């Protein structure tokens, strides 16, 4: 993937930055930097309790397009929106069934994804053109801190080229997406 050198107007190959973060001593500066990349529409791969996710600003149509491009994924394949706080669910959904709170309190944070009617805040690029949005709240502390630093809503399919095995390490992500995304944490 190419990026523009704003100073000289020259296109150059993107270099993916890797920031090693110890889950027992989280580098808040690295989290803030990754969050800023996401807020500005860039892509950051990050760990969850299952696999590495390819994070983007879930409320940014252009960020969704970048996700599909980096993965080589069809744009009608919806992305899952990750949240860090249950209260954030009401901003991106409508007509939430009462059973949701019971499920969320039992299974979130954790690897449960629930599907809801989307609010107007969520672009169709994120939902693959659907009127519904898939939402989950990961239990991984690094993931949750990143989601908060990014503004609360991060779309994140697995951080791999479509059709390849889901990555379980930063090295797997690097081998597959180096040069296509801004950062791996």
Across the structure, where does each feature detected by a protein language model lie?
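Short, low-complexity, charge-dense intrinsically disordered segments
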Residues: 1-5
């Amino acid at each position: 993937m190419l990026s523009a050198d704003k100073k000289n107007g020259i296109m150059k190959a993107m270099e993916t930055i890797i920031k090693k973060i110890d889950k027992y001593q989280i580098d808040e500066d690295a989290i803030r930097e990754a969050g800023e990349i996401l807020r500005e529409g860039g892509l950051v791969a990050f760990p969850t309790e299952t696999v590495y996710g390819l994070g983007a600003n879930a409320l940014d149509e252009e960020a969704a397009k970048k996700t599909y491009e980096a993965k080589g994924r069809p744009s009608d394949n919806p992305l899952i929106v990750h949240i860090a706080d249950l209260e954030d669910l009401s901003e991106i959904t409508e007509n939430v069934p009462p059973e949701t709170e019971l499920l969320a309190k039992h299974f979130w944070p954790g690897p449960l994804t629930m599907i809801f009617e989307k609010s107007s805040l969520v672009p169709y690029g994120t939902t693959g053109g659907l009127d519904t949005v898939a939402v989950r709240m990961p239990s991984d502390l690094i993931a949750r801190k990143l989601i908060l630093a990014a503004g609360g809503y991060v779309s994140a399919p697995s951080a791999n080229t479509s059709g390849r095995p889901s990555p379980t390490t930063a090295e797997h992500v690097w081998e597959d997406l180096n040069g296509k995304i801004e950062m791996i944490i």
